């Protein structure tokens, strides 16, 4: 456990390094501390913090920078939040009112503002699958001698359309297949369809030619309802951080943004501050050993259609207080908590 003075020194170093991207010297710490303490004491405490792996010493400078452990302690114990900027709050509210109640549009607009302010890339990921979403109807509609359409209607009113080329599959076989699908899968939750296909396959094998093509096409279409829709906003803002002048680091962060599933990354055990909503803040090696220079701040927003994840990705040296507070503000506005408190 850190002493009160050590905690203050760590807080000063983290805050100053976030602002300047420069190692923080003992002299600078002394200037920033709001307590009277000698430079020798600061050097001793800084050395102790380094020994405990809260700080790292840069070879090119006499100053120190935060380690992942130092950032984590800062986020968990030292991070403070300013009063909300009223103009920002009103701006976000106006977006909400203009866009109605469609949360995905609200988040895409709000995420652009957050990205510009934090210099982090914002990712809005909508998880389409509602836990109660079911297949309600499957219809076959012949369009011509060579083409037919299969319509899947889901319990939320959403429709999926799949075209079949009748040169590859006969209309008769397609009709038989759709009847089998309807008999076995209507009123089945979408999330369970993959598991139920094994029950359908033997029947298709014995009654339908090219059953594997029909089955593969059917599954690829219906499973689209389970896929997450991802919108990446503000990549250029993140690139303003000098950390991403390194091509290798940039390649890694782009790869994670393109391939990550925020729903898998989200972990409430990394909650940033118990006074706020559940916001997961992962730093460096907490994400992966290969991503030691990256941070992820995110939260899950529940809707009637499922969940939407708001994720911020940036370098390890970001303003965690600002990122957490902005996410918290957006969720408050979306949930209506802001109006309750007025």
Swiss-Prot record:
Function: Negative regulator of class I heat shock genes (grpE-dnaK-dnaJ and groELS operons). Prevents heat-shock induction of these operons.
NCBIfam families assigned: hrcA
Recorded superkingdom: Bacteria
MF annotations from Gene Ontology: DNA binding
The name this protein goes by in its record: Heat-inducible transcription repressor HrcA
InterPro entries from the UniProt entry: GAF-like_dom_sf (IPR029016), HrcA (IPR002571), HrcA_C (IPR021153), WH-like_DNA-bd_sf (IPR036388), WH_DNA-bd_sf (IPR036390), WHTH_HrcA_DNA-bd (IPR005104), WHTH_transcript_rep_HrcA_IDD (IPR023120)
Keywords: Repressor, Stress response, Transcription, Transcription regulation
Pfam families: HrcA, HrcA_DNA-bdg
Encoding gene per record: hrcA
């Amino acid at each position: 456990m850190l002493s009160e003075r050590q905690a203050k020194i760590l807080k000063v170093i983290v805050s100053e390094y976030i602002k300047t991207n420069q190692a923080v010297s003992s002299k600078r710490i002394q200037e920033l501390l709001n307590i009277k303490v000698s430079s020798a004491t600061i050097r001793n405490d800084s050395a102790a913090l380094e020994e405990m792996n809260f700080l790292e010493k840069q070879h090119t400078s006499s100053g120190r920078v935060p380690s992942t452990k130092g950032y984590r302690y800062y986020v968990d114990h030292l991070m403070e939040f300013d009063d909300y900027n009223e103009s920002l709050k009103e701006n976000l509210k106006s977006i909400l009112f203009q866009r109605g109640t469609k949360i995905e549009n609200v988040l895409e607009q709000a995420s652009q503002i957050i990205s510009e302010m934090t210099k982090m890339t914002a990712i809005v990921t909508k998880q389409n699958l509602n836990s109660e979403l079911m297949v309600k109807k499957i219809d076959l509609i012949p369009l011509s001698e060579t083409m037919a359409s299969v319509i899947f209607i889901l319990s939320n009113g959403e429709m999926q359309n799949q075209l079949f080329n009748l040169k590859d599959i006969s209309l008769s076989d397609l009709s038989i297949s759709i009847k089998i699908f309807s008999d076995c899968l209507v009123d089945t939750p979408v999330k369970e369809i993959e598991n139920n296909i094994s029950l359908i396959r033997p029947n298709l094998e014995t009654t339908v030619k090219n059953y594997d093509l029909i089955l593969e096409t059917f599954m690829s279409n219906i499973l689209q309802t389970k896929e997450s829709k991802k919108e990446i906003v503000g990549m250029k803002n993140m690139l303003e951080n000098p950390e991403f002048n390194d091509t290798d680091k940039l390649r890694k962060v782009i790869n994670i943004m393109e391939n990550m599933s925020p729903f898998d990354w989200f972990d409430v055990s990394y909650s940033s501050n118990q006074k706020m909503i559940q916001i997961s803040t992962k730093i460096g090696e907490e994400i992966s050993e290969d991503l030691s220079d990256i941070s992820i701040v995110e939260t899950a927003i529940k809707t009637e259609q499922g969940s939407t994840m708001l994720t911020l990705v940036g370098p390890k040296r970001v303003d965690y207080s600002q990122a957490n507070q902005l996410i918290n503000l957006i969720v408050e506005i979306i949930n209506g908590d802001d109006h309750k408190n007025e």
